[in-house]
């Protein structure tokens, strides 16, 4: 047993080891399994394996069971499993991983490396492929890079060697091979590495390698090596190759090659040799792989290497070498010197390294001279064209490749329309531009100063501007400007003080620029630099002087300045337009409640009223004439009479209606349609309760009876007759008691109306007309609830309502004065407005505004009164119109007046220029309308009384008027009598009830109804 027990622990160890091996094997197979932790632990005697075999407890010892004195003693730190576990746990905390995890990570990394090496075709040929341990052990980027370098070194080196042999001279080949080896190692490592590394890593590695190689090769290749690194990296670049060969090879090479060539181009553009080299390289490069446009675009752009196509990422990164710095410096700071210095340094490096520099330099100028014209032509024009496309920014005219004036600091923005200094082509271009720019010379209107002085000032100004704008320009530009710049600056300062001379300066500057271009190339260059400055100067002057001439100075510049001037002019014009707009906007007020001008609205409201009334009465003029004088006097008297009548007979609305109808009938005795009229009047009265319907019915019925207008009047008069024939006459007499005594008053009224039969007829006509007009207006107004009229006729209706109120008050007074025609006339004037108010009152009766109904009754009485009353009524109408004109109508909300049916905004005349009585009546109308609404039960009782007495249709309109009268009793007896008179008048003139209803609408929107009624009366009176 002891032996077994002793053997078992080794078995456990072996099993643990085997398990670990299995784990690793499993990992090798692809399964990821962490090695068993107990593999490293010391064997535990008490493992389940020990208990696998049957134990004979009689013979089993404690050791076999794992119980030993050692088990009770702490094992050494290295031996105890618990301690090891704790250590592992502790080490694992915050640590990269436990031994198991580290082992797993390493194994996985190895497996991945092996797979990558197998997959990558380049790695297959690499010598390191035979030793996967290299890949397995590769833990750092450098190791990987070295592995790839070793793998691709031979291939890349061979390729580069062949390229070098093809393009380089014999003595240069060895140097080329060295350079290519250096570059090739990095390039091959990086080029082969891309399979594993990302493009960014490749670029970075290329940059590193290219930077290292460039330090050696920059001088030799003159920045061309970087291009060759991407393709046949060092070989084609090396100075041994002629520029023609180099350019052809570069053309064959990727665009990246041209990218770095663009750097030398930017550098060489300043020097003729450099320009020639760049042109040659660009020419061939464009013909081969990259177009000169892209090349020039690269030159123009600060991040030329970044701008290059993705095929040349290495070259892009290679650019950050001193060459790239040179290009950036060219863009940022003076640069011609920098480029020359950088080139010189490269040449010196070539001298030292290969001694091939002289040949390269000689080759460069030769090739450049040969291809100068072709390359410059092909390169420059498409170059700046493509530059425009690529940059998508055009500073005025097309920019030549010299747009970036190397003499100027890179951060100096190009002047719009201006081009940087160029020695050859740009001078011609600048001369052309200068010649073109002076085209607006005839425009220089401000010749306030002498031209000579202006010319003198202009040249220094231009130079000074150039100097000031570009203080960092090359010494050439400064020397060209020379002392002239200082003198020009002084002159400019002198001239700057007078703003008037500035305009002349611009024109003179143009002339001077042309002359300068003719004088010398240096002057042309200065002027070329100056055009932008001049543009700026012109802009400044234009801004300061704001003269139109400044827009003329130069084409592009002048156009821009003109645009600015035009814009300013437009702004000024816009201001005027805005002012007009303000005025226009003032016409339609922004407020949702437009305040209608009284006079203009009154006139349009008249035709609208006529239109409304025309349907009911054909003879508008006739009815208007009768109606105008008749209604005011009658209304006044009747208003007086009706209030008293209604007060005495208060609730006998039927009697009141009878009296009104009797009065109307008496007034309409001359009319033969009395029989027809009763029904019509009854219909009208009923319709007056239902204002729109009553109006339409009464008017429609009245029209067939005696012509559209006259039948209406006749109908209203006959209604009065019928009322008088029936117990209504008695009621009318009772109401007439206000004038005298019951029936006598009625007779007096009849007589009063008959005082002048013609006038009475006119009054009847007018009453009828007013009734028809009121019916119409009621129909049209009541249907929209006087909203239409409130808007257009609100002012007139308000005034009419005021007048109707005052007239109703007068009528309340005039029942006693009814005997006197003069008082009736005075009342007529008011009653005219009262007639309107009557129509409104009828409408208000519907709406709960009963005051207008009483005014209607007064209008009926007016119709019964003499022709003098008609005259007075016409006068009153005129006065009402005048009052309306003088009055300012304002819409006010009836929110506080809960009794008014018409809720919302109502037209009210604030000044109420009408008589105090009218003003009171108006206020009473509006105020009483609410009171009338509160009095509606009384009205209902009166209407109920009148209904049994009157025919139901007649009683209905009477009820509509009667409630108005009843309600008017509480707020004011005048109001009641007014409503009663309107009830009688509703019988007499259901059309007047329409008017009254309109006026009642005016109670809510009194102004609109009153305005409509007044307009109708005026139109009728005029007709």
Swiss-Prot record:
Coiled coil: none annotated. GO terms for molecular function: protein phosphatase regulator activity. Interacts with PPP1CC. There is a cross-link at residue 762 (Glycyl lysine isopeptide (Lys-Gly) (interchain with G-Cter in SUMO2)). Residues 679-691 have a biased composition (Low complexity). GO terms for cellular component: chromosome; cytosol; nucleoplasm; nucleus. Its main location: nucleus. This is Cell division cycle-associated protein 2. Residues 979-992, 1000-1010 have a biased composition (Polar residues). PANTHER family: ANTIGEN KI-67-LIKE PROTEIN (PTHR21603), CELL DIVISION CYCLE-ASSOCIATED PROTEIN 2 (PTHR21603:SF16). Residues 1-14, 696-706, 803-816, 1013-1023 have a biased composition (Basic and acidic residues). Regulator of chromosome structure during mitosis required for condensin-depleted chromosomes to retain their compact architecture through anaphase. Acts by mediating the recruitment of phopsphatase PP1-gamma subunit (PPP1CC) to chromatin at anaphase and into the following interphase. At anaphase onset, its association with chromatin targets a pool of PPP1CC to dephosphorylate substrates. Residues 389-449 form the PP1-binding domain.
């Amino acid at each position: 047993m002891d032996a077994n027990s002793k053997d078992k622990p080794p078995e456990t160890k072996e099993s643990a080891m085997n398990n670990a091996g299995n784990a690793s094997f499993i990992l090798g197979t692809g399964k990821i399994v962490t090695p068993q932790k107990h593999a490293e632990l010391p064997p535990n005697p008490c493992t389940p394996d020990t208990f696998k075999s049957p134990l004979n407890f009689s013979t089993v010892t404690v050791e076999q069971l794992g119980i030993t004195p050692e088990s009770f003693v702490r094992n050494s730190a290295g031996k105890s499993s618990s301690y090891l576990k704790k250590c592992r746990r502790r080490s694992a905390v915050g640590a990269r991983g436990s031994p198991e995890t580290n082992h797993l990570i390493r194994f996985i990394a190895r497996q991945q490396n092996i797979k990558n090496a197998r997959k990558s075709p380049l790695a297959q040929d690499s010598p390191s492929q035979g030793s996967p341990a290299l890949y397995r052990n590769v833990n750092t980027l450098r190791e990987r890079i070295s592995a790839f370098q070793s793998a691709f070194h031979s291939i890349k080196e061979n390729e580069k060697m062949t390229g070098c042999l093809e393009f380089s001279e014999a003595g240069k080949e060895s140097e080329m091979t060295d350079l290519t080896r250096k570059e090739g190692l990095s390039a091959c490592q990086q080029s082969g590495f891309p399979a594993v590394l990302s493009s960014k890593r490749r670029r970075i590695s290329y940059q590193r390698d290219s930077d290292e190689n460039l330090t050696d090769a920059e001088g030799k290749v003159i920045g061309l090596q970087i291009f060759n690194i991407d393709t046949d990296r060092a070989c084609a670049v090396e100075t041994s190759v002629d520029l023609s060969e180099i350019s052809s090879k570069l053309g064959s090479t990727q665009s990246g090659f041209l990218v770095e060539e663009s750097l030398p181009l930017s550098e060489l553009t300043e020097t003729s040799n450099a320009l020639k080299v760049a042109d040659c390289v660009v020419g061939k490069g464009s013909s081969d792989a990259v177009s000169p446009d892209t090349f020039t675009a690269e030159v123009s752009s600060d991040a030329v290497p970044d701008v290059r196509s993705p095929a040349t990422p290495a070259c892009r990164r290679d650019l950050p070498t001193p060459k790239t710095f040179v290009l950036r410096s060219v863009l940022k700071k003076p640069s011609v010197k920098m480029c020359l210095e950088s080139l010189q340094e490269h040449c010196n490096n070539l001298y030292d390294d290969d001694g091939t520099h002289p040949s390269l330099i000689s080759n460069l100028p030769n090739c450049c001279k040969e291809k100068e014209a072709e390359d410059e032509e092909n390169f420059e024009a498409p170059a700046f064209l493509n530059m425009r496309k690529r940059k998508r920014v055009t500073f005025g005219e097309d920019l030549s490749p010299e747009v970036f004036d190397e003499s100027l600091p890179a951060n100096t923005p190009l002047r719009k329309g201006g081009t940087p200094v160029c020695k050859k082509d740009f001078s011609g271009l600048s001369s052309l531009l200068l010649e073109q720019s002076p085209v607006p010379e005839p425009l220089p209107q401000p010749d306030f100063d002498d031209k000579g002085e202006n010319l003198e000032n202009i040249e220094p100004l231009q130079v000074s501007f150039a100097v000031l704008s570009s203080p960092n320009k090359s010494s050439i530009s400064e020397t060209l400007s020379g002392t002239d710049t200082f003198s020009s600056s002084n002159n400019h300062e002198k001239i700057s003080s007078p703003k008037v001379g500035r305009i002349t300066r611009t024109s003179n500057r143009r002339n001077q620029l042309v002359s300068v271009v003719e004088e010398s190339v240096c002057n042309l260059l200065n002027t070329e630099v100056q055009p932008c400055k001049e543009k700026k100067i012109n802009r400044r002057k234009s801004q300061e002087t704001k003269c139109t001439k400044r827009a003329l100075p130069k084409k592009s510049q002048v156009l821009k300045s003109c645009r600015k001037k035009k814009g300013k002019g437009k702004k000024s014009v816009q201001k005027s337009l805005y002012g007009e707009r303000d005025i226009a906007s003032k016409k339609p007020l922004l407020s949702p409640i437009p305040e209608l001008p009284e006079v203009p609205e009154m006139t349009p409201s008249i035709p609208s009223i006529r239109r409304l009334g025309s349907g009911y009465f054909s003879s508008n003029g006739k009815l208007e004439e009768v109606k105008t004088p008749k209604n005011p006097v009658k209304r006044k008297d009747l208003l007086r009479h009706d209030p008293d009548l209604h007060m005495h007979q208060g609730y006998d609305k039927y009697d009141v209606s009878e009296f009104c109808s009797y009065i109307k009938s008496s007034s309409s005795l001359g009319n033969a349609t009395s029989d027809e009229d009763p029904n019509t009047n009854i219909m009208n009265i009923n319709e007056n309760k239902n204002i729109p319907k009553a109006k339409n019915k009464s008017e429609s019925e009245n029209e067939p009876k005696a012509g559209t207008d006259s039948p209406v009047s006749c109908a209203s008069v006959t209604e009065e007759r019928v009322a008088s024939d029936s117990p209504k006459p008695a009621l009318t007499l009772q109401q007439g008691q206000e004038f005298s005594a019951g029936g006598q008053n009625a007779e007096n009224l009849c007589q009063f109306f008959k005082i002048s039969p013609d006038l009475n007829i006119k009054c009847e006509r007018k009453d009828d007309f007013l009734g028809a007009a009121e019916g119409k207006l009621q129909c049209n107004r009541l249907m929209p609830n006087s909203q239409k009229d409130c808007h257009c006729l609100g002012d007139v209706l308000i005034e009419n309502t005021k007048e109707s109120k005052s007239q109703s008050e007068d009528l309340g007074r005039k029942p006693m004065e009814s005997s006197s025609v003069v008082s009736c006339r005075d009342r007529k004037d008011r009653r005219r407005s009262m007639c309107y108010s009557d129509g409104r009152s009828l409408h208000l009766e519907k709406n709960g505004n009963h005051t207008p109904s009483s005014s209607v009754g007064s209008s009926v009485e007016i119709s019964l009164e003499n022709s003098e009353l008609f005259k007075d009524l016409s006068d009153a109408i005129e006065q009402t119109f005048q009052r309306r004109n003088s009055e300012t109508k304002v819409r006010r909300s009836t929110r506080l007046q809960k009794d008014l049916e018409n809720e919302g905004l109502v037209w009210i005349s604030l000044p109420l220029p009408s008589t105090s009585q009218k003003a009171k009546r108006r206020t009473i109308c509006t105020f009483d309308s609410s009171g009338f609404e509160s009095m509606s039960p009384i009205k209902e009782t009166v209407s109920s009384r009148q209904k049994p007495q009157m025919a139901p249709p007649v009683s209905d309109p009477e009820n509509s008027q009667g409630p108005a009268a009843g309600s008017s009793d509480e707020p004011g007896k005048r109001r009641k009598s007014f409503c009663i008179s309107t009830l009688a008048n509703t019988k007499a003139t259901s059309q007047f009830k329409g008017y009254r209803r309109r006026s009642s609408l005016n109670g809510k929107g009194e102004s609109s109804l009153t305005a409509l009624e007044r307009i109708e009366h005026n139109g009728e009176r005029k007709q």
